């Protein structure tokens, strides 16, 4: 893998010359490496100004290589839970617009935590997920990203977690949304087991819903799920590589989602430094994830296609912190507050790296805020497919100009979660929020509490400025409300007041 680093500067020089001496270049390959529940500080790559204890704990050498080759995005955001991020990725739409605002699984059902809630009756959101047809109830009708790429000549591979549609609905199978190949993707958002000796959960009839499909040749073997997926990815890549066809690989790992389980290839070092049991499991899963990244990068380099491949690394939400971890809850994403499910930074700010041999810049870090909605137009621009037609109106804005060091207006970023996740903790609940520049405004639906933070000075969100900067608060409340109304965003019904939750700009502080 060190060859990657040694060849990087030679490679970019070669590409600069070749790309400028030809009127037409071949379509770039795209590798989108999506990790599940990986926190902003769960790697040995630091995305903050200071290195933290977590950066020193976890071992992710291949992420380090990718970051040295590419560009770190230090203000990258997803949604607080998984399915909304994945639908935004596939459609370019914000969750408030596509209305898949919570995680999907069972058809025609809200989540258990939403049913018979003591305060709220939650809206009839799109719990059946994505759809390529406009006639299916409680789905978002859209033209998915892989379908557009496939229609433009790309060989499309899905590997790992899908979680795009409820059980029995077409989008639960990635083959129905434009992928040529589906490796182990289905409706569920977590595996029953990561272990081949457990048949990845397929020998547990009680919880069959979580069993990972399609990896039967690894059943009974001493192999971790991530390793099995990596081997399948390498096999499926050979067809487009050998035929010199452009490919889109969406490698969507189940790691590091619970249940926490040891990848025995990586546990010894963490046992030797005295970590407790669940943290040993978690650290081994982080390293397992990184190893999978390295396997793919090495194969691309060995087959001489990395020079024509854009690699994007991202997590689907903030790091797990409310459950399953050792130590005090909600403190595993320091300096960020809280974790998965929360509207605080620990729940939505995620690690992101982009390597593109086609964008010649000396910058190694981009601080411009971006969000998962932006991936759809960015990948279309990367692949010269931005003129393609699609049925949805998108919210995303391409981040490709940032890689060319161009000045881009800092648009507001929006989050909307008119739902209930289940676990209790800071910032976990039903809420809406906006970030504009350095300012972040949060509106909690149940308590009607509003908060304002200057993220440049207070990344940990400890100093609520709502009472000292009412004008900025009102401005952001207006921006948030205008957007929510423009997309006809759903709001919960308050059973105590017998009314729909008011819009943010209707808060008593502003009236």
What positions do the PLM features span?
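Formylglycine-dependent
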Residues: 105-155, 162-245, 253-262, 283
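Active-site segment of extracytoplasmic enzymes that catalyze sulfate/phosphate-ester chemistry
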Residues: 32-33, 40-143, 148, 202-203, ...
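Long, internal low-complexity/basic segments
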Residues: 23-28, 35, 40, 72, ...
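A long, amphipathic alpha-helix that forms part
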Residues: 224, 228-241, 268-309, 326
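A short aromatic-rich beta-strand->coil structural motif
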Residues: 30, 36, 161, 233, ...
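A short beta-strand-to-alpha-helix junction
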Residues: 54-60, 74-81, 107, 113, ...
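Histidine-centered active-site microenvironments of extracellular/periplasmic hydrolases
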Residues: 170-178, 259-262, 298-359, 371
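C-terminal cap/loop subdomain of S1 sulfatases and analogous C-terminal strand-loop tails that border
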Residues: 181, 319-345, 360-364, 368, ...
């Amino acid at each position: 893998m060190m060859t990657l680093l040694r060849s990087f500067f030679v490679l970019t020089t070669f590409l600069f010359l070749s790309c400028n001496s030809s009127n037409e270049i071949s379509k770039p390959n795209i590798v989108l490496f999506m990790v599940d529940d990986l926190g902003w500080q769960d790697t040995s790559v630091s995305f903050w100004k200071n290195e933290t204890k977590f950066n020193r704990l976890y071992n992710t050498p291949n992420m380090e290589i990718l970051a040295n080759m590419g560009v770190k995005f230090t203000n990258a955001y997803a949604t607080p839970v998984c399915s909304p991020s994945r639908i935004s990725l596939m459609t370019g739409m914000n969750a408030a617009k596509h209305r898949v605002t919570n995680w999907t699984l069972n058809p025609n059902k809200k989540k258990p935590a939403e049913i018979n809630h003591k305060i709220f009756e939650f809206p009839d959101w799109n719990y059946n997920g994505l759809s390529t047809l406009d006639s299916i109830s409680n789905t978002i009708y859209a033209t998915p990203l892989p379908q557009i790429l496939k229609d433009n000549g790309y060989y499309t591979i899905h590997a790992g977690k899908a979680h795009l549609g409820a059980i029995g609905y077409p989008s639960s199978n990635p083959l129905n949304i434009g992928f040529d190949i589906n490796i182990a993707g289905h409706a569920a958002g977590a595996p029953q087991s990561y272990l081949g000796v457990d048949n990845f959960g397929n020998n547990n009839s009680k919880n069959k819903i979580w069993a990972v499909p399609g990896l039967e040749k690894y059943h009974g073997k001493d192999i971790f799920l991530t390793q099995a997926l990596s081997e399948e990815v390498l096999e499926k890549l050979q067809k487009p590589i050998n035929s010199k066809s452009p490919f889109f690989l969406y490698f969507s790992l189940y790691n590091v989602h619970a249940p926490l389980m040891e990848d025995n290839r990586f546990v010894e070092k963490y046992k030797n430094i005295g970590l407790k049991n669940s943290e040993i499991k978690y650290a081994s899963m982080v390293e397992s994830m990184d190893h999978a990244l390295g396997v793919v990068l090495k194969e691309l380099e060995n087959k001489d296609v990395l020079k024509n491949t854009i690699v994007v690394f991202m997590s689907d939400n903030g790091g797990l912190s409310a459950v399953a971890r050792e130590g005090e809850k909600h403190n595993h994403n320091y300096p960020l507050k809280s974790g998965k499910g929360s509207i605080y930074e620990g729940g939505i700010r995620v690690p992101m790296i982009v390597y593109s041999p086609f964008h010649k810049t000396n910058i190694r870090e981009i601080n411009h805020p971006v969000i998962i909605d932006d991936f759809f137009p960015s990948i279309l621009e990367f692949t010269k497919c931005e003129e393609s037609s699609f049925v949805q109106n998108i919210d995303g804005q391409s981040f490709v100009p940032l890689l060319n060091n161009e000045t881009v207006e800092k648009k507001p970023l929006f989050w909307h979660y008119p739902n209930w996740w289940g676990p209790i903790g800071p910032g976990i609940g039903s809420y809406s929020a906006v970030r504009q520049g350095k300012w972040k405004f949060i509106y909690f639906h149940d308590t009607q509490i509003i908060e304002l933070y200057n993220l440049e000075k207070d990344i940990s969100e400890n100093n609520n400025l709502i009472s000292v900067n009412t004008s900025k608060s009102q401005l952001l409340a207006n921006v948030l409300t205008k957007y929510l109304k423009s997309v006809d965003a759903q709001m919960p019904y308050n059973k105590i007041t017998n009314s729909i939750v008011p819009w943010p700009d209707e808060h008593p502080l502003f009236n």
